[in-house]
Design a protein with these regions (language model features):
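Hydrophobic residues on conserved beta-strands that form the core of alpha/beta folds
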Residues: 53-55, 79, 130
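A generic structural signal for residues located within well-ordered alpha-helices
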Residues: 37-41, 65, 100
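Short, solvent-exposed loop/turn elements at beta->coil junctions and helix N-caps
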Residues: 56-61, 133-136
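Domain-level recognition of nuclease-like catalytic cores that cleave nucleotide substrates
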Residues: 2-9, 116-158
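Acidic-basic catalytic patches of nuclease active cores, encompassing PD-(D/E)XK
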Residues: 3-57
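Catalytic cores of nucleic-acid endonucleases
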Residues: 83-139
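A short beta-turn/loop motif at secondary-structure boundaries
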Residues: 59-63, 122-124
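Conserved catalytic cores of phosphodiester-cleaving nucleases, focusing on short active-site segments
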Residues: 42, 46, 67-90, 105
């Protein structure tokens, strides 16, 4: 584990604990709070794996939704969808990334790529992929985080 990441993760956890202790309550519905906790856990999980996160919750005004995380895994640009669940009784977390969600993520990724600076080399595009990170926060069990690299591609027919 990278020491700086562990320290940052402990600091964030301590701040969350202090906020709860002082009575701070979010106005968000519980499922959105669970999702935010999962995205934070996924962020630190990926950082420990060596990913360089360049954006969190990236939005483009004309497209609904967001890209949860955008990160470099070596020389590969990754668009990462995080799905968090507090139960395994229903469908898997990754099954929530259905055809419509994949279409939205592809649209957002195209918009993200358009706003990047022009590369020095004409027609250069870095290798890219769409990953899914699943986070399970089951009562009485340690958090379970899994990375599914290249979970789907650019084609609509996957």
């Amino acid at each position: 584990m990278r020491p700086g990441i562990a320290i940052l993760e402990r600091c964030v956890a301590s701040l969350d604990w202090l906020a709860a202790r002082r009575g701070y309550r979010s106005d968000l519905p519980e499922h959105l709070i669970t999702g935010e906790r999962g995205e934070e856990a996924a962020f630190f999980f990926l950082r420990r794996k060596g990913f360089v996160v360049v954006a969190r919750r990236w939005r483009f005004g004309q497209v609904p939704g967001d890209l949860d995380l955008i990160a470099w895994d070596g020389d590969v640009l990754c668009f990462i969808e995080v799905k968090t669940r507090s139960s395994k009784e229903m469908a898997t977390a990754s099954s929530a990334v259905d055809r419509d969600k994949r279409r939205t993520l592809r649209r957002l990724a195209r918009h993200y790529l358009r706003q990047l600076p022009e590369p020095d080399e004409p027609n250069f595009q870095p290798p890219m992929r769409f990953d899914i990170v699943t986070v399970y926060e089951l009562p009485g069990k340690p958090r379970e985080i899994n990375l599914m690299p290249a979970a789907f591609g650019w084609s609509e027919h996957e």
